[in-house]
Amino acid sequence: MSDSASISSGIADRYATAIFELAKEENNIGALEAGADLLDAALKESAEFRDLISSPVYSRDEQAGAIGAIAKKLELAPMLSNALALMASKRRLFVLPQLVASLRALIAEEKGEMTADVISAQPLSKANLDELTKVLSASADKTVKVNATVDNSLIGGLVVKMGSKMIDTSIRAKLNALQNTMKEVG
């Protein structure tokens, strides 16, 4: 991990822990989870939002005003909207994607759940997703929430990341392994 990624992750983890502890104190983890989901969806859907949080062109006041409007529009819980306002005033909004990921991890841990990131070459059907969720839950002895994404470059197969484990059954990985083997022989 690069130094800047490590620093960003550290900043996001500190904010996430503080927000999570506050939500836990107020018995408001459900609202925090809903807010994290809304922020994640907004980040994925809006290029302007991603630009706002990462571009140095916007001033603190512009970022604070925009993030306040977004928090109001999304009807985020006060603890989350206040944290976003603080992050804007400190020019820390660039860690928002990592913050959302950290919040989700803390919430999942609190609920005894685990998140699995599944990358497939083609979209998984509902039946495939349900079966995969069931198998992963059985292997982890926890409730598993699956985040499914599509990456056509895999050619076929799946890449499953769950906790510190990664299983790569993609055609791309097998072709790369074959290529490396052929380099060693030749």
Curated annotation (Swiss-Prot):
PROSITE patterns xrefs: ATPASE_DELTA
Subcellular location: Cell inner membrane
GO molecular function list: proton-transporting ATP synthase activity, rotational mechanism
Keywords, in A-Z order: ATP synthesis, Cell inner membrane, Cell membrane, CF(1), Hydrogen ion transport, Ion transport, Membrane, Transport
Gene name per UniProt: atpH
Pfam short name (any one): OSCP
Positions in coiled-coil regions: none
Designated name of the protein: ATP synthase subunit delta
Subunit (UniProt): F-type ATPases have 2 components, F(1) - the catalytic core - and F(0) - the membrane proton channel. F(1) has five subunits: alpha(3), beta(3), gamma(1), delta(1), epsilon(1). CF(0) has four main subunits: a(1), b(1), b'(1) and c(10-14). The alpha and beta chains form an alternating ring which encloses part of the gamma chain. F(1) is attached to F(0) by a central stalk formed by the gamma and epsilon chains, while a peripheral stalk is formed by the delta, b and b' chains.
GO cellular component: plasma membrane; proton-transporting ATP synthase complex
Record-linked Gene3D superfamilies: N-terminal domain of the delta subunit of the F1F0-ATP synthase
Topology of the protein relative to the lipid bilayer: Peripheral membrane protein
Family: Belongs to the ATPase delta chain family.
Function: F(1)F(0) ATP synthase produces ATP from ADP in the presence of a proton or sodium gradient. F-type ATPases consist of two structural domains, F(1) containing the extramembraneous catalytic core and F(0) containing the membrane proton channel, linked together by a central stalk and a peripheral stalk. During catalysis, ATP synthesis in the catalytic domain of F(1) is coupled via a rotary mechanism of the central stalk subunits to proton translocation. This protein is part of the stalk that links CF(0) to CF(1). It either transmits conformational changes from CF(0) to CF(1) or is implicated in proton conduction.
